[in-house]
Design a protein with these regions (language model features):
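Short SAM/SAH-binding signature in class I
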Residues: 144
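Short acidic/His/Gly/Ser-rich catalytic and metal-binding motifs that mark active-site loops
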Residues: 42-46, 98-100
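Conserved SAM/SAH cofactor-binding pocket of Class I
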Residues: 73-141
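N-terminal auxiliary segments of SAM/dcSAM-dependent transferases
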Residues: 1-43
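Conserved SAM-binding loop and adjacent beta-strand
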Residues: 58-76
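Glycine/charged-rich beta-loop-alpha catalytic/anionic-binding loops adjacent to active sites
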Residues: 48-57
Length: 144
């Protein structure tokens, strides 16, 4: 696990003390992997304190959302839509769409998310996949 991934896991453990992340391949997008919540994470009842902590700092980036996976697969099948272009992944989460766009030939991809841990996840996942992304926490500060 890379230093970025270790940092990401440590941040996750502030909310979910026993949670770990692992590099996982994605279905139907063979050459893309993400650091996601370990699939065997305990599914036992949580205390009210744990639930409150999760509500206050939801870690949306620990899952690959179906819409992101579908978009990544679509970009694989239709790279001409992003090849040679500048792309914004708004609400990037784990960065799956940003990474897929970069792999499909986008000149620059900006992963934008208000959650600093999501941006850390994007950085760790970009590193895992050997791509370079740009990052922004504020859409309004992006320049053309």
């Amino acid at each position: 696990m890379t230093p970025l991934a270790q940092q990401l896991e440590q941040q996750l453990q502030r909310t979910l003390a026993t949670a770990t992340i692992t590099a996982q391949s994605l279905p139907d997008v063979d050459d893309l992997a993400l650091y996601l919540l370990n699939p065997d994470y305990p599914r036992t009842p949580m205390s009210s304190e744990q639930m409150q902590a999760i509500w206050q700092e939801p870690a949306y980036w620990i899952f690959c959302w179906a819409s992101g996976l579908a978009m990544a697969k679509w970009l694989r099948e239709n790279p001409d839509y992003v090849r040679g272009k500048r792309v914004l992944d708004f609400g990037a989460g784990s960065g799956v769409v940003a990474i897929a766009a970069k792999q499909a030939g986008a000149v620059e991809v900006v992963a934008c998310d208000i959650d600093p841990l999501a941006l850390l996840a994007c950085k760790a996942n970009a590193e895992l996949n050997g791509v370079e992304l740009s990052y922004s926490q504020n859409f309004y500060q992006l320049t053309e």
